[in-house]
């Protein structure tokens, strides 16, 4: 339906393809890896029928959006989401993320706050990395990062976490 420019690379615009349908309270659907905004086509009709304004977009590097050589980190994804919300002048927004999209929502809230948001939904969410590291200086100490999680869960999650880390 349209594009939103979120930056430039080598004097070329970085554009995100988006679709904006319906009216009412806006709900922004954020796809997972390696999908695009079309992955929500099964949910969109019901949301439109329920009276929502439904916005989907292809994250940079996915679908019909630009494929720049940089910017594939959650800070940039969150900033791109912020540009989408600002450009479309969205308020009282419901953000729904699937898989990788949940990390984008979490980072968005951390970087840009909740002023534009009414609700968020995390579907098939990524496990957060809680421990303090060089690239996560605000995390919890290692003695606390897993303190509320049963050791058997951590043991069975390690292969999944390792796989997810390698994919992203």
Name each model-derived stretch:
Residues 106-155:
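Flexible "cap/lid" loop of the alpha/beta hydrolase fold
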Residues 75-93:
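Conserved acidic catalytic loop of the alpha/beta-hydrolase fold
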Residues 95-97, 123:
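Short beta-strand immediately N-terminal to the catalytic nucleophile in serine-hydrolase-like folds
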Residues 9-70, 84:
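Conserved HGGG/HGGXW glycine-rich cap/lid loop of the alpha/beta-hydrolase fold
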Residues 26, 51-53, 91-94, 116-119:
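Structural signature of beta-strand start/N-cap positions in the alpha/beta core
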Residues 155-168:
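Alpha/beta-hydrolase
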Residues 97, 101, 105:
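Gly/Ala-rich beta-loop-alpha elbow adjacent to hydrolase catalytic centers
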């Amino acid at each position: 339906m349209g594009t939103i420019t979120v930056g430039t690379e080598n004097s070329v615009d970085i554009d995100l393809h988006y679709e904006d349908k319906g009216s009412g309270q806006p709900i922004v659907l954020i796809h997972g890896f390696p999908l695009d905004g079309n992955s929500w086509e099964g949910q969109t009709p019901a949301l439109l029928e329920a009276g929502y304004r439904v916005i989907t977009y292809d994250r940079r590097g996915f679908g019909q959006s630009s494929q720049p050589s940089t910017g594939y980190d959650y800070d940039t994804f969150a900033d791109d989401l912020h540009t989408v919300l600002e450009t479309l002048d969205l308020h009282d927004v419901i953000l729904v993320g699937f898989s990788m999209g949940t990390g984008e929502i979490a980072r968005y809230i951390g970087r840009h706050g909740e002023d534009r948001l009414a609700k968020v939904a995390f579907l098939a969410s990524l496990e957060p990395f809680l421990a303090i590291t060089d690239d996560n200086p605000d995390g919890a100490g290692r003695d606390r990062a897993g303190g509320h999680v049963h050791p058997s869960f951590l043991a069975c999650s390690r292969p999944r976490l390792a796989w997810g880390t390698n994919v992203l």
